[in-house]
């Protein structure tokens, strides 16, 4: 969080999220710095938009946002499980050890959905996968 970097291949989980300051108890919006820069530069930044996204809503549902922005700023929950697996597989071919990559499912995912992700990972020669089911 300090340097806004990652050693992994995870896509951004959220463009905006809330965090409570332990010193004064205030809740602050943390905004992806690249998204914020584009929002300000192209005139669609607003605190209302940041609060809307921090509540877990998708940028794809917001009217008035340029399509190119919506196409760039896709978050992990919006990516299909198969695409998560294929992203991991693309890296796995060049790495001898296992790769840490979370396969995100929404709350309605079934046991069969998870099984299909595991089978795709096996077919693509991934060394393992991690599954996260929202909610």
Language model features by range: what are they?
Residues 1-135:
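Catalytic alpha/beta core of large soluble enzyme barrels
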């Amino acid at each position: 969080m300090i340097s806004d970097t990652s050693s992994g291949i995870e896509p951004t989980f959220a463009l905006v999220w809330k965090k409570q300051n332990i010193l004064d108890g205030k809740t602050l919006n943390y905004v992806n710095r690249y998204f914020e820069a584009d929002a300000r530069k192209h005139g669609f930044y607003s605190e209302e938009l940041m609060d809307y996204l921090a509540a877990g809503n998708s940028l794809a549902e917001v009217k008035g946002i340029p399509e190119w922005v919506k196409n760039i700023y896709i978050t992990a929950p919006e990516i299909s499980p198969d695409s998560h697996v294929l992203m991991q597989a693309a890296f796995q071919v060049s790495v001898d050890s296992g790769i840490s990559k979370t396969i995100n499912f929404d709350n309605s995912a079934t046991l069969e959905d998870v099984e299909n992700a595991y089978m795709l990972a096996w077919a693509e020669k991934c060394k393992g996968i991690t599954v996260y089911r929202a909610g």
